[in-house]
């Protein structure tokens, strides 16, 4: 209701099991005449692979994994900065688990949370993502200065606010063009990186961990990521 705090992360009191999730997914598909993809968003946590396995069996079309380094204007800072695991580890473990269970082809994986530049996109695709999504990077393109005051509704740049006097500070046309410039630049950079790898399509990069090497990572981290040390 207006005037009350938003709870983030929001609880889902109608989902306490995979069976509950399956029923919700089925209901949503029925309500949309099976014309819309159903996306289930999960946090990057220590048992994310097991959770994703259940989601894949629920009938959902897409799993969205959110890494702990992602930005949010609603969650308490202690939650935002300390709860969860890096998206790279979560993504790699989910992709591997679904492959081992023979159900990777049944569902798509998208990821976000700390996707800050084109190289992050390349790494995510190589670790098994079908696509990525961005939020903070897009806000920066619009003109966000990372004031970290989204939750107050007093964004000085007119982005995270509903106040008319602040909203008018944001020029939609200029903001749109800046975002287009960002994505076009990333596309160009990704093409260059793939060219350096000798790869000519995103499909050839997807899940291709042979293209990655680890620097300063522990043996366990390398094992989870499914990559080798630099120099190997």
Q: Language-model features: where?
A:
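C-terminal extensions of enzymes
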Residues: 174-232
């Amino acid at each position: 209701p207006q005037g009350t705090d938003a709870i983030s992360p929001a609880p889902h009191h109608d989902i306490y099991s995979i069976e509950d999730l399956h029923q919700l997914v089925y209901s949503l598909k029925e309500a949309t005449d099976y014309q819309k993809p159903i996306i289930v968003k999960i946090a990057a946590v220590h048992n994310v692979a097991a959770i994703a396995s259940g989601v894949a069996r629920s009938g959902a079309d897409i799993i969205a994994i959110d890494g702990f380094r992602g930005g949010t204007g609603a969650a308490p800072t202690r939650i935002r900065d300390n709860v969860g695991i890096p998206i790279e580890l979560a993504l790699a473990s989910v992709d591997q688990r679904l492959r081992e269970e023979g159900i990777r082809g049944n569902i798509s994986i998208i990821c976000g949370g700390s996707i800050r530049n084109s190289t992050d996109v390349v790494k995510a695709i190589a670790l098994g993502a079908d696509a990525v999504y961005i939020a903070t990077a897009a806000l920066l393109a619009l003109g966000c200065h990372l004031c970290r005051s989204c939750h107050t509704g007093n964004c000085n740049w007119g982005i995270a606010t509903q106040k008319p006097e602040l909203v008018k500070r944001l020029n939609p046309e200029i903001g749109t063009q800046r975002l287009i410039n960002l994505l076009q630049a990333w596309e160009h950079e990704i093409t260059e990186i793939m060219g350096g790898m000798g790869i000519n399509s995103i499909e050839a990069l997807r899940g291709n961990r042979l293209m990655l090497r680890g620097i300063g990572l522990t043996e366990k981290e390398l094992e989870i990521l499914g990559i080798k040390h630099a120099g190997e």
